[in-house]
């Protein structure tokens, strides 16, 4: 049996319509139980802040959580040593909402001035990532079909049935990150918002699929 193998490439440009704020809470405390308690209290405080902007407490989603031992280096008689100082927690969370610069400015101002002072970064995504992935895959298959048709005509053969379709099924990152980290910015005391004027660029995606046809 003779076959032809063709790899098709799909490309897609998406206009992001969802704003994502990723926040990180951190702290170091002498006792493990104390570290857990503070991590829980800080998370609840963050939920309190966000609830003032129309978010349900369940809208704040955990991306990762860890507690690790923390050591510090010191020098003793020309020898560097380490000593245990406690436990460090790191809690990464996210919240998403339909893109709105005015709302975003108020949220970022509140985060910058709240007691727990999380580190945060801003990114953008789309409201229906699954539909985007399916459209991208469809474009890749269509590209493979068109290439196979051109090649088979040029070679004087006919395409028959598809023998196999090979696709990696890897996760496609549908996210645009204009800034990786945001720090506190100076703002007049009477203000309650940052003036945000962000127009995120389109998200460009690409993926490939390999199709094998029988030919005659």
How would you name each of these model-derived features?
Residues 1-216:
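Short, charge-dense linear interaction motifs
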